[in-house]
């Protein structure tokens, strides 16, 4: 393979998008894949923040074929053969072991938070086998040197400072020489092994495991009587509850149900170690059946379902590397850390990493010194060096882990979870609008990890802190998120049903430092 400027290990969506950007910057790129497309991958649910990140990357780096992936309607028009699913919001149902679920008239046992007002600008679930293959082909079409079935075995640095990657491809020796390397695989990936990067646990985070597969024949909750009837005076939910990231929450963990447009549904569980051991999660499908037997209403939903592939068991779900970058190398956030699929944090974290590394490539800083010429345009949340990139990547992972740990602690008392979840929904909705109308207000990191008031409050009010911290939790969370609450959250009168209402964001314009008409114009352009 010819010498390149940048070797990217892993051709998932993050690696391929970074390869596309690097090619637009005029860099020579090698994109190296251990497997072969199409191939299964977990991490399938997008979000509004991920959508705007895709839009902005596409606009900044002249990648018009990337932009339709930002919204369901544009995706269907541009790429109807690339399978995705409709994600209108976030749906949560609280289950008690051994008891049937019945939607409470006061909605106290479920939560619905819309992410869009209609299908056309909705988020999506990505069938990764289709989407990753599509993005890999796009990167190759832009000139990235793509090689699959690559087994990398070593990394050395030559006397000129270039990285030399050695391995095999289909039985033949392979050598790639690059000025820099990005690991876009996953936890414990190539660079972590080759460089001996250590790992550490997230402080205070529970041990968790996961089991998942793809299914056909999964029933819709909105066609089951147990899940209907919570509206008042004919009021319907803010979106179809199944056209969402649907979560079945129970003590010790949760299940995701993500529907694709081809009749396949992704479903899996993430549970704490004690429950995993009780279920003997390593048994795969048998463990899945044991869990369904404990959740009779969920069992009914899967009564006609059949897995279309083997079950995957992850004996340790969370991971954190001790470093995310060094001289001329970096890990994408997906390779540096992983917390949990809860709240679909993986997509925006990965794309934030792509955006930051793209800025370092654009300036030349990635390779050790800024290149001559004009200073490139500053990006939202831009970092000045690979060390700064490493610091913010791991800080955001730690912050996300602290939040998810609080959510797990809140599962047994569902109202605690509902109240605490408002930290996520307030921060995410604010960031989405701020990136459109006041970018400087979005430069505090994912989930406002760098906000000197918001971030400490998120940790202080965590249900993981114990019962003493739960007194008046709802009121305390409402006060903590008030400066960034532009989505009408924390309102008892809404009874856990939150629609995507432009009026809420327009009313919150002062919190963004702009005039209401600026917000109204941005939302109108988006399609609200």
Language model region names:
Residues 7, 23-44:
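Glycine-rich FAD pyrophosphate-binding loop
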Residues 1-14, 30:
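Beta1/beta-strand and adjacent pyrophosphate-binding region of the FAD-binding site
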Residues 80-130:
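Flavin (FAD/FMN) cofactor-binding and adjacent substrate-gating region
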Residues 14, 37, 188:
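Conserved Rossmann-like nucleotide-cofactor binding loop
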